[in-house]
Amino acid sequence: MQKNAVVLTGAGQIGMAIVRRVAYGSKIFVADWKLENAQAITKTLVEAGFDAVAFKTDISSRSSIIELIEAAKHAGEISMFINAAGLSPSQSTKEHILAVDLYGTAVLLEEFGKVIKQGGAAVTISSQSGHRLPALTEEADRLLATTPPEELLKLDLLRSENIRDTLHAYQLAKRCNVKRVMAESVKWGERGARVNSISPGIIITPLALDEINGPRGDFYKNMFAKSPAGRAGMADEVANVAELLLSEKGAFITGADFLIDGGATAAYFYGQDNR
């Protein structure tokens, strides 16, 4: 008897916390561009009783994504997809961040939308950073939402000369993620499936520690110190929301984004410094 297949892209703490909640009894494909990262998460899952396999995937490559999907389909129908892959502003160049976080996510949503089973669901991890980007025009939002993935990086607003730095590239990518989820949810609905995004704030993971200990470290520490929650978040707190979105309890939720940042974005716009 074939199992359902659950695919995780991005072998990190948030992704692992989510699959531990939702994927017991399924065949889990843990994909990462660094195979050793996928193997480490897979080992932890297997030792906890899960059926998991590691897979090397470059999400900036459509062919690599399709290869992952084909492998998962051999195990069973793909019932859930969790995308927790991405690069932070301190980890790479503007161009690479856009290729992975923006283009890669757009392709993932498109390709998994073609194969997700009826009743299936997906979550992609975006970021609070996209909520801090000043409002774009209605036309810019439409282009980010609906431009075919192979044409996305040719848009004027995504040309290198129009992007200030890696943080700006990251913010645009995360804004695009949310808009793509909205547009893709309409197509996913035709298959009886759902897709949503989660925009976490500072969650203690190796990726976040790169930022906290990087050149913008003081900015991030000050940010969560001034937030209503007064602290950084935990991966399990993101998984709490993902579990709802991937379950039948979230059956009426699709095309939505959930900001989980301890109120940091609220403080950014409306805190004491802005009164």
Region spans (language model):
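Rossmann-fold cofactor-recognition segment
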Residues: L45-S63
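A conserved structural motif in NAD(P)-dependent oxidoreductases
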Residues: G15, S227-V238, K249
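Short, small/polar-rich loop/turn modules that mediate ligand/substrate recognition or access, typified
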Residues: R194, I253-G255
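Conserved glycine-rich Rossmann-like NAD(P)H-binding loop of the short-chain dehydrogenase/reductase
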Residues: Y24-A40
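A glycine/serine/threonine-rich, flexible loop-to-helix segment
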Residues: L136-T147, I203-K226, A267-R275
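Canonical Rossmann dinucleotide-binding motif of NAD(H)/NADP(H)-dependent dehydrogenases/reductases
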Residues: M1-F29
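Catalytic loop of short-chain dehydrogenase/reductase
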Residues: P89-Q91, Q118-R191, P200-T205
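Conserved NAD(P)H cofactor-binding loop of Rossmann-fold oxidoreductase domains
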Residues: I82-P89, V100, S126, G263
